[in-house]
Design a protein with these regions (language model features):
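C-terminal closing repeat unit and adjoining cap/tail of repeat-based domains
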Residues: 227-272
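Multi-bladed beta-propeller domains
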Residues: 8-24, 50-65, 95-110, 138-156, ...
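Conserved beta-propeller blade repeats
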Residues: 22-37, 64-79, 108-126, 152-170, ...
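Structural motif
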Residues: 2-5, 44-46, 88-93, 132-136, ...
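Loop/turn-rich, solvent-exposed surfaces of beta-rich toroidal or solenoidal domains
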Residues: 175, 196-232
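Beta-strand C-termini and the immediately following turn/loop, strongest in propeller blades
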Residues: 37-43, 79-86, 116, 124-130, ...
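Beta-strand-rich domains and repeat architectures in extracellular enzymes and scaffolds
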Residues: 1-35, 39-40
Length: 276
């Protein structure tokens, strides 16, 4: 599989490739200063400088089974990862931005990180408890987790709005996977999309005016890789939903927050099968 890391400008409607590799890489995050992308591959994390420099491995200590649920703190000082090295199930850890020893955040497993609150104090994630997929939040210092959803369908992929008022997530509670949102205190649950596509991984823009989502054909269950998918953009309330473009991807394309600091661009991964 060949991976193409690309950046799309929502103002011009143009995309550019910033890196291509024969390895599988996933889920690019923009750094808060916009100078590099953070992504995962082969259980590790890498920085891709956008000035054309070399890709650099991030020291994640003992955590060498990182998945594609990772990100950077709003102030740019820390990295959050989801890794299964220590327990055999995904746990959430925080480590310094330049690498170092991961600090365990979640005691309950498995847990998959997806969002960092704008004030830097809380994490949002998908936790699987008694075979139920639900949305949880927790302090960056660890401690007790707060459950926001309650076992209606599969609930996954939470990401905060820039004003901190909403957590967007995808849920199959009405059948087909759709985008929903809820206040961080667990009130105000609302359905945002209700069309005939399987909608995943809602990422509100830093400008708090648009939400990016990834959409599968309705026949697709879960969020597999290596399929034709669509990246779509909509207003915060789900209005003016439009397809930006189609690509070959899915799992790994935009699993986690991927907007540039200014909110005019986002990063993603497109995949190309390698012929034998």
């Amino acid at each position: 599989m060949r991976s193409s890391v690309e950046i799309y400008n929502v103002r011009t409607g143009r995309a550019r490739e910033v890196w291509q590799t024969d390895r599988l890489v996933e889920a690019p995050n923009f750094s808060p200063d916009g100078s590099y992308l953070l992504m995962n591959g082969d259980g590790l994390l890498f920085r891709l400088p956008l000035d054309g420099g070399d890709v650099v491995k991030v020291d994640t200590g003992f955590a060498i089974n990182c998945n594609n649920d990772h990100g950077i703190s709003p102030d740019g000082t820390e990295i959050v990862i989801s890794d299964k090295t220590e327990f055999g199930k995904s746990a959430i850890y925080i480590l310094p931005i330049d690498g170092g020893t991961p600090r365990l955040i979640t005691q309950n497993l498995p847990s998959y990180w997806h969002g960092w609150s704008p004030d830097g104090r809380q994490l949002a994630y998908c936790g699987i408890r008694d075979d139920l997929f639900d949305i949880y939040t927790i302090s960056v210092d660890g401690g007790a987790e707060t459950r926001l959803t309650h076992g209606e369908g599969r609930n996954d992929g939470p990401d905060w709005s820039a004003d901190g008022q909403w957590i967007y997530f995808n849920s199959s509670r009405t059948g087909l996977m759709q985008i929903w949102r809820i206040h961080p205190d667990g009130t105000g649950l609302e359905q945002v999309t209700s069309d005939n596509q399987g909608n995943w991984f809602a990422h509100p823009s830093p400008a708090n005016d648009k939400v990016l989502i990834l959409s599968y054909d309705p026949s697709v269950f879960d969020h597999p890789r290596d399929l034709d998918v669509r990246l779509r953009l909509m207003d915060m309330d789900g209005g003016n939903l439009k397809t930006l473009f189609e690509l070959f991807g899915g799992q790994g394309t935009i699993n986690v927050p991927n907007w540039s600091p200014e909110g005019d661009e986002f990063a993603y991964v497109r995949y190309f099968p390698v012929k034998s």
